[in-house]
Amino acid sequence: MAALTLLSSRLRLCASAYRSGGAWSQGCAGYFSTSTRRHTKFYTDAVEAVKDIPNGATVLVGGFGLCGIPENLIGALLKTGVKELTAVSNNAGVDNFGLGLLLQSKQIKRMISSYVGENAEFERQYLAGELEVELTPQGTLAERIRAGGAGVPAFYTSTGYGTLVQEGGSPIKYNKDGSIAIASKPREVREFNGQHFILEEAIRGDFALVKAWKADQAGNVTFRKSARNFNLPMCKAAETTVVEVEEIVDIGSFAPEDIHIPKIYVHRLVKGEKYEKRIERLSVRKEEDVKTRSGKLGDNVRERIIKRAALEFEDGMYANLGIGIPLLASNFISPNMTVHLQSENGILGLGPYPLQNEVDADLINAGKETVTVLPGASYFSSDESFAMIRGGHVNLTMLGAMQVSKYGDLANWMIPGKLVKGMGGAMDLVSSAKTKVVVTMEHSAKGNAHKIMEKCTLPLTGKQCVNRIITEKAVFDVDSKKGLTLIELWEGLTVDDIKKSTGCDFAVSPKLIPMQQVTT
């Protein structure tokens, strides 16, 4: 008992010395390492915190879109002028903010990311051969970073099997004439329990630039709402992690169970001088807004698809919805039904768009739109989000497509040499055999070009992954061996009409019915 009392007394003395900034006492040293390498170093100037990042370094940069990006640390890199960086980030912000600023200043040599998005300069530099881009599925990117922080050198995943990710040949760098200068390498493939998986290697950075909400004087960190995204796994996956925060508080301000990142991962801390917290897509609703259900059913193509897609929801279901038609279909979920909407940037329990006075830059969906959450919602990191997705815990994923093949192959992420948006989280979303994959799209492309075809001509997002196709003309069930079966047909159209506008053959269900629409 006397020994325990002595230990307790010395622990209190050590904690007191730590809070006051004093040195550890000799008594403390008898119980704890005196190595200063474990102590978080605090900075008052962001430039000082990053000035030793050398040319050619690999830098992990947190954030999703513009949400949770380390604004001050990115600005500091602009001032240091460091060049030839390999930047690992989900995307590259926008043209004039976030990592887009470092692209404009030509400080980045290679991007490892999942999504080009709406950053026109990013896309221009890539297609012009000025920038190397290693496009990586979003969930795979998150897991590669997580593995790097956990000391796992590589892992197997079903994401990307049967695509350019597995086969190799995806352009990393173009020549000036549009030919491929550097192509991705093939991945090793193994089979487990009848399913194919590819080998992905972990990512570790020389430095990680992370944005958090608050830190205490010990270096423990917390995040706010959906701003944790890639920040959390990146914190653990670099030789030197630099965290910028909005506020530094006293030790003891956080309950231990409320700490998101323990101090062991945080090497440097700086309080951000100022924050713009720009919003990429401001989406709001008005007080009087109600679900848009006016007009005759099916009076336009888009509405027709939306109102059929809404019938895919079931009570208690967990669903991930792509931007556009899939997300709009959620407006028609029955009030007698509960559907839990998951967003891959780290939200479970998405709600409607906010009122103007509810807008929060730290709360966005995967489409970078401002959102709200419903009671019972939760926030988590990107690696946790894709554990839900890849692990088959999400019942339904609904997304758009450029092309779908007869046997359920999906293409929706690039047109080589012309359009490069990146795969984002789509490859992960369609990778689990436990998740129903529903494609919503217009039946034909411009010029009546086929989108439903014998074989996709564009690079695949997933192989034999689609279970159902919903267009303005028809609904097909998809079997990976037997092909398509027409199960619903829009009123006024015939089977021959569908044959003319479809680029492959299909069976017709003996129970063919008129195309259904959600009731209003």
UniProtKB/Swiss-Prot annotation:
Single annotated GO MF: protein homodimerization activity
PROSITE patterns given in the database record: COA_TRANSF_1, COA_TRANSF_2
Enzyme class: transferase
Record annotation: effect of changing C67S: Decreases KM for acetoacetate and acetoacetyl-CoA 2-fold. Increases KM for succinate 2-fold. Decreases KM for succinyl-CoA nearly 4-fold. Strongly reduces catalytic activity
Pathway: Ketone metabolism; succinyl-CoA degradation; acetoacetyl-CoA from succinyl-CoA: step 1/1
Catalysed reactions, as listed in the record: a 3-oxo acid + succinyl-CoA = a 3-oxoacyl-CoA + succinate; acetoacetate + succinyl-CoA = acetoacetyl-CoA + succinate
Family matches, as Pfam families: CoA_trans
InterPro entries: 3-oxoacid_CoA-transf_A (IPR012792), 3-oxoacid_CoA-transf_B (IPR012791), 3-oxoacid_CoA-transferase (IPR014388), CoA_trans_fam_I (IPR004165), CoA_transf_AS (IPR004164), CoA_transf_BS (IPR004163), NagB/RpiA_transferase-like (IPR037171)
Outcome of swapping C67A: Decreases KM for acetoacetyl-CoA 3-fold. No effect on KM for acetoacetate, succinyl-CoA and succinate
Subunit annotation: Homodimer. Only one subunit is competent to transfer the CoA moiety to the acceptor carboxylate (3-oxo acid).
Similarity annotation: Belongs to the 3-oxoacid CoA-transferase family.
Full protein name: Succinyl-CoA:3-ketoacid coenzyme A transferase 1, mitochondrial
